[in-house]
Every structure is written in structure tokens, then in C-alpha cells.
Amino acid sequence: MLKSRKLFPTALLTLLVAAFSLPAPALANHTQATYFEATPLLLSSTTRAATIAQLQRLGVRALRVELSWHDVAPGSNSATKPAFDATDPNAYGWGAYDAIVTEAARLHWKVLLTVTSPAPRWATSNKKAPYVTRPDPKDFQEFMTAVGRHYGAGVTYSIWNEANHPAFLMPQWNSNGTPASPRIYRGLYQAGYTGLQAAISSPTVLFGETAPTGYSKVNVHREHSRALLHDVAPLAFLREALCLNSHYRKSGSCSLLPMSGYAHHAYTIAAGPHYVDPNRDDVAIGTLSRLSNALGKAAAAHAIPANLPIWLTEFGVQSKPNRFLGVSVAQQAEFDAIAEQIAWSNPRVVAFSQYLLRDDPVGGAPGASVHGGTVGFQTGLEYVNGKPKPLYASWPVPLTATKSHGGFSLWGYVRNATGPTTVTVLVRLKGSHSYRTLKTVTTNSLGYWTLGTSARGQFFRVRWTSPEGVRYEGPPIK
């Protein structure tokens, strides 16, 4: 995408002093829960308490946790399934997952539990690492009954992480070049949903959890076996999993799948949050309308419930030192806020999630995990050494600024707000080294606010002081 529009300085200082205001744009008519995923730090007993304290200061009230089937299952590295009642939660070693869910309950935080691969070795078709090949639906159904009995109706469930990516589910493609993973996933989802129903009468379950990019078709003749390692584009995956053809018409006798929402990971590239991928089956944050339209067509075909909400359950902006997808840390803070505003502006989106508090170590090139390597994500609020990035200061009080009607439209959010509160908006002119108060604005009951202004500052930032006296000040936004 193009970089964020550069804001031009005002020609008259009186505009700054008077802070002439334009009518504020209307707020979107829906709420948007914000989830945070910091599973590696939360799973460790040595970092859990400090991480929870950090998340509280940042304004977190909901967690996404990826629950690995392999981590908790008995005999998970054995080729032979042990003799045990797979529907009995007492047969599993829930370990640190229980500690996370218990702490979240104490804090009255919501929990989204994504149950995912790797599977136990004995539950896969080839019994080979990384244990993601054709997991057995019957085994998964029994496991999900145990999961539901253990964690109950107090959490939201999501079935499988990025099933359209070969690092999490194999095979992605059949030897003839047709997609394989969508129908495998459909079987796993149906089994998992049935398993949860045996434990919970009306479970809240998300479908999809799709990665943002992939291939709509592959050329096995040209690429041979390499073609089968490509990920499946999310909308191509959606259609095949729902038994729809390219025109979103039912193909076959598949019934409607029950679900509470569609989960997606709308990552974008270094071009920024408004980037439009030329593959129309890809869905990044800048092309959310593609997913909205696809879900509408799928509902019209009676493949899914009508008016299905979108959950953006994993998102982050890569920063340097990621040499493939990273932007500067200043741009990371700006792009992250823009992406959240895009999600907030879409009335179908009910959840947005930040992936990583602390960066991973720098790993291999994108796709390295398919070949047994590691991929480091630099989407965190902190560097790998724990030093904060600008995003750490901006995430609790995100701010965007865009040209609008002869002036600028500002949008912001105070995550720690528990009701209407006041925020100080600051502006800095070109050539100036200091900020001045533009206006004090009042948020709505959820903490969101907007402001239209004719004051053309070069940089804007916000300042908010909590009722406990903790001061939050975001970084400069161009």
C-alpha cells in the first residue's frame, strides 16, 4: 500500500491556539473486543506473573490461547494410542494452560481457546513429525469432549490454527493439484463441534482461523512435489471447506455448518494496512470486504448461518529487524493503529487481536517452517530482549490521523477506560520542537473517540491519565 498520508503543517499559528474543530465523524455502531496473545510468556511459570501485570497495565481484558493437542495428550510421541478414556479430562495433562485460564477467570478476562496442532503422533495418518498429517477425526472428537468438559462454557472455542497453511495441517493439496486441506479441516471441525456438544449444550465455536494468503491453484506439472507445500488461499479454502464452487454455489450434498463466527488472521505486508493483494482469494486487513462478501455469499448458499460475525483472532505488524516484512518501529505503531481502526470501522468485525507481547528471535524466511525451519515474528510491543518499542506506548492509546474535509480526522481509543473519560490531544507544527494542547476530548462509554480539526499539525499524539494516576502518552503520529 501507499504510506500513511503525510500531514501538512498549518500556515497560521492562530489555528493551533484556537484549535478550530470540525464536526466529529460518527462512531461505528458496534463493540469490538480486543484480545491479546502472549502464550509463550504465559505458559512459562517464570514469566507468567510479570506478563499478566504488564497486560493489565496495557489495558488487556481478553486472551487468545492456542492449546496444542500434542502438549496435553497422554503418550503423545508414541505411534500407538495408549489405553485411556479419551473423553475424560482427567486423562490429560493440562498443566500451564489451566494456570492461564484460572488467572484470566480471576481477572474476569475473556478467553478464546484455539485448539490446534500438532496432534499426538498416534492420531496422525503417517505417524511422522511434525504430526500435522490427516489427524483422525474420531480421536479429535473425543479430545474436544474432554476439552469442553474441562473448560466448560465460560470460554470461546476455535478449531485449528491456520488449517490452510502446511505448517499446521497436511496435506494442503492432493497429488492432482486440487485442494486437500479444506475438506480435511471440515471433517475435523465437524468432529470437534460434535465433541464439544457432548460436553456443552450450546458451545460458542469459531470456524476458519485462516492465514491471510495462499494459492488458489497450483501447477503440479511445473513444480512437482513443491507445489503441494503451498498454502491454500483463504477464500479458496473457505469455498472448498463449505462445499461451494467458484461462484459460491453449493457443490455436493454438504449440510449447513453450525458456527458462532468466522476467525481470520488479516496480516498484511510491509506496504502497510491499506495494501490490496492482487490475488482476490487473499484477505489482508486492507481487503476485509472480500471476506465479508464471501461470508454473505456462503450464507445465501445456506452453507453457514446468516450474518456471521468476523473475529480477527491474530494480527500484528512486523517491524525490523525482520528483513522480509519489517517496517520501522515508528511505522509499526502507526500501521497497527490504522489496522485496528479499519477493523473497528467494519460493523461485521466483533474482535481484534494483537499477536505477541515480545518479539520472537529472528528466524528464517517466510515459509521456512514448512521445511522444518523457524519463522520469527517481530510483531511484538517489545524487542526480543524486553526493551519496549514505540508500539508499547501507543497500544494502550492508539491514534490515527487522516486528511478529511480541509482538515484532519483523528480517531483514538483508551483501552483502560471503564466508562467515558477525557483524553488530551496534542499537536506539533513543522519546525517546532514542542507539543501544544489541541483539544481535550471525551470518549464514549467504551473508550473510543473521534475529532475533526482544521489545525494542520505535522505530528499528533495523545495523553491520558487513569483514575489511579497512571499516565499514558502515545508516540508521535504523522
Could you describe each region identified by the protein language model?
Residues 27-62, 66-68:
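Boundary/entry segment of secreted carbohydrate-active catalytic domains
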Residues 58-227, 269:
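Substrate-binding cleft and catalytic face of glycoside hydrolase catalytic domains
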Residues 1-12:
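Bacterial N-terminal signal peptides that target proteins for export
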Residues 447-451:
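Short strand-edge motifs at loop-to-beta-strand transitions and within beta-strands
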Residues 36, 63, 104, 147, ...:
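Conserved, mostly hydrophobic/aromatic
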Residues 18-26:
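C-terminal segment of classical bacterial N-terminal signal peptides
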Residues 79, 163, 168, 174-179, ...:
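Aromatic-rich peripheral "rim/lid" segments of glycoside hydrolase catalytic domains that contact
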Residues 45-49, 141, 177-330:
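Noncatalytic carbohydrate-binding groove/subsite architecture in carbohydrate-active enzymes
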